Amino acid sequence: MNSEKQKQLISYIAPSAPATRRPATGNEAFLRPEIGFTPKWYHDALGIDFGEQWHTDVVYRRKSLISMGQELMRRFGNRNIRWIQHPDEPPDLLTGTFGACTIAAIYGLPLIYAADNWPNCEHQYLQSEQIDRLTPLDLDINPFFCKFMDEVEWISHQNGRIEGYINWQGVLNNAYRLRGEELFIDMTLEPNRARHLFECVTMTMIEATERLYECQRQTEVHIQHSTVSNCLVNMVSPDQYQDLLLPFDQRIASTAGLIGIHNCAWNASAYIQHYATLPSVGYIDMGIESNLVNAKESFPDARRAIMYPPVELANKPLSEIRRDLELITHDYAPCDMVFADIESGTPDDRVIEVIELCEEMSEAL
């Protein structure tokens, strides 16, 4: 196994979960597809209710995961979808829990559950005075976190191993959920207020992650990476990112053996030079409009990935998707092709076609 590849992360999408990252094996294909479907896709196919019970009742969640795995097998056979490929591994009962709202919920924002979607949080934004008085939370007495850790303990006792990941999001994403659009005004007019909020959020993210990882280590699951979701980074200038946010991403990176950076399908070109200063980047993703050549040069040892928009997957002619993949193969690969958030109505044949395109291009190289 290539030792450098052991220092990489790859995209990972558990059934119905938002995309996250996991350690690479070192045997990844040159152009590796990662396929993921939304809760609505599974709700429409199987009638699974992804409301509050799915996120708080592990028994219910486990039963639904079995059904989802069976549906994937029925529709896609032995295609390159990881949940199909490894049915005998201890089940991952953690990934997808509370969607992308765990940190917001820890800070007291009520969650809004839906039968066919990930949770959202109510827009009960903190006011300026509340931000100024904010302190890092005491997780020992935090009601939401304590209840979540009860789930983790149940998984440990019943499953033996606590497999999976919580999507802790990123500093900017979490701060936006707490502050709303006023955050961007703070970053311009009251940068110290923004820094204070980022500080509190970062400390909570790190402490919550470390507590979960310690529980997982006790079940022989050793996770040594962190991942940050910078879905809103295009809302701030590169200079603002460098000044106000990069120090916190650096702190998160310094606590982990590897860090993964998620940018959604946006153009990440303007931020690449700053991301390149982070230590031990094991994964970075971006949209196809990014400067892929520069990204490859800037992150030669990381596993790179392209987030391919689900609307384009569903609607683009296959010939155009092929051209996109050829460009990516030439300028950016080896990399993951992340086909996430696939919705109901996307033909199964289209999913199979893009998997086969990735396999064809990998085999050619």
Give the ranges of each region predicted by the language model.
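Conserved donor-binding loop and adjoining core beta-sheet/short helix segment
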Residues: L109-N117
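Active-site loop segments of alpha/beta catalytic cores
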Residues: M1-V58, L137-L365
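A gly/proline- and charged-residue-enriched helix-loop-helix capping module
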Residues: D116-D150
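Membrane helical hairpin/interfacial module
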Residues: T56-P110
